Regions:
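Conserved PLP-enzyme active-site core in the AAT-like
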Residues: 1-133, 137-146, 151-166, 174-185
């Protein structure tokens, strides 16, 4: 808390960043007063986030949650999935990062202009197919027809994310789809 202003970390992708940097989440959030972590992004829990901070902050958050009707009954099954995510899924994030690097390298082999020279640090690969948002949406639609789901970002940018359900075969088929679209027969 600097100058009396508490600092909060939105840790939606904190585990990915920690694995990529070789740090613990504790080290990453050491200079903040509170942090949330998402258990579904990358960690494969069906739902859930965890809020951490000083005891008085957590007590106040619980009160506000109850006032807003956020109390969840019979949450043991969801909590169990969250525990599995925390205990068993963090280590495998490095596999997602490695597949993102492989995807990035394969895309650069097809068209070097598509991706920056630097490898991605985590599991997100950005591909600039054009400078036009309309062209990016066209690529998105054509890739979807080939079974590859991507998101469009800013003008001409596609965003690909690797995760537990993306294996080496999926990376290969994604690269094949991009190659077919880049060089149609």
């Amino acid at each position: 808390c600097r100058h009396g202003v508490p600092v909060h970390t939105d840790g939606a992708r904190l585990f990915n960043a920690a694995v990529a940097l070789g740090l613990s989440c504790r080290e990453m959030a050491a200079h903040t007063d509170s942090v949330t972590v998402c258990l579904s992004k990358g960690l494969s829990a069906p739902v859930g986030s965890v809020l951490m901070g000083p005891a008085d902050f957590i007590a106040r958050a619980r009160t506000i949650r109850r006032m807003l009707g956020g109390t969840l009954r019979q949450a043991g099954v969801i909590a169990a999935a969250g525990l599995v995510a925390l205990e068993h899924m963090v280590e495998r994030l490095a596999d997602d990062h490695a597949r993102a690097c492989r995807l990035h390298q394969g895309l650069r082999a097809i068209d070097p202009a598509w991706c920056a020279a630097e490898l991605p640090q985590t599991n997100i690969v950005q591909v600039r197919v054009d400078t036009s948002a309309a062209e990016a949406r066209l690529w998105q639609a054509r890739l979807a027809q080939a079974g590859v789901l991507v998101r469009t970002g800013s003008a001409g940018l596609l965003r690909l994310v690797t995760h537990r359900h993306i294996d080496d075969a999926a990376v290969d088929s994604t690269l094949q789809a991009f190659a077919r679209l880049q060089h149609p027969t």
